[in-house]
UniProtKB/Swiss-Prot annotation:
Domain text: Key residues/motif important for the effector activities are degenerated in most NLPs, including the nlp24 peptide consisting of the conserved region I (11-aa immunogenic part) and conserved region II (the heptapeptide GHRHDWE motif) that is important for phytotoxic activity.
Entry similarity comment: Belongs to the Necrosis inducing protein (NPP1) family.
Protein's cellular compartments: Secreted
Protein's name in the database: NLP effector protein 13
Name of the gene encoding the protein in the UniProt record: NLP13
Organism the protein comes from: Phytophthora capsici
Amino acid sequence: MYSWYFPKDSPSTGLGHRHDWEHVIVWIDNPEVPEPKILGVTPSAHSGYSSQVPPDADKVDGSSVKVKYLSKWPINHALESTGEGGDFQDLIMWTQMTDAAREGLSKTGWGKANVPMVDGNFEAKLGKAWPFGEKK
């Protein structure tokens, strides 16, 4: 799961809210192998998901998936798989964060937004986003 924080989710005047967390889940066949196969991609959109299983070839760049952040006017912002090129972003693993950083993410009041990768949300988000048949 890759997550992004946005200070505001307001695609149109008068609508929206402070704080937004969006995420994309990349489903792989085996995390133990050096080059796992990407089986599916599930980007978040507000409180829902869209899935591509398997992802279209143009939406994958080697071992990375291509995702864009967009405004779904007039309601909210979302992540979506894309065939467009872009930049790579640094990855910070949950286990690389300090205890203070993890605690801050877990205990801060984010209003209507939910931090997807904290212990209280992580497994539920994976279950809701599961794209392979019956939900886990």
